Amino acid sequence: MQILKDIEAIVGTKGILTGDDVSNRKAGIWIDEGIKAKAIVRPKNTEELSKVLKICNENKQPVVPHGGLTGLAEGAITQAGQIAISTERLNEIEGIDTVGRTITLGAGVPLEKAQNVAKENNLMLAVDL
């Protein structure tokens, strides 16, 4: 499929999963079946993410965001023709401003890691699940 080739040109071979690499991944921590999607795209920065979403939009390709796949809201259930956009590689601590008391995190930073970074810098992450 051309759209998948175009996306791979942006994210590289490590940034896109297809076939068994998709279906062998669990759809969530509470779901035993595999993910049903055309592909899982794993951008490593917002520039790649933006380019991928532009291609998907131009091709009217449905996408579903994938975060931690806890399934608490069941908002990340994909269907066979859709593309999952995973945040797993968007996992960098981008900046810590102790004066402004802010931390800039990638969308894929696990909550526990974010809380630990905040604590190490005498800050508090105001999210509690």
Region annotations inferred by a language model:
Residues 1-29, 58-61, 68:
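N-terminal accessory segments
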Residues 7, 31-63, 87-129:
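N-terminal glycine-rich flavin-associated loop
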Residues 16, 25, 72, 93-96:
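Short clusters of hydrophobic/aromatic residues that line enzyme substrate/ligand-binding pockets
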Residues 30-33, 77-79:
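Short glycine/serine-rich loop/turn segments
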Residues 55, 60-65, 70-77:
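Active-site cofactor/substrate anionic-group-binding motifs, chiefly glycine-
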Residues 74-79, 115-117:
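Short acidic, glycine/serine/threonine-rich loops at helix termini
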Residues 80-87:
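Short basic, glycine-rich beta-strand/loop surfaces that mediate nucleic-acid
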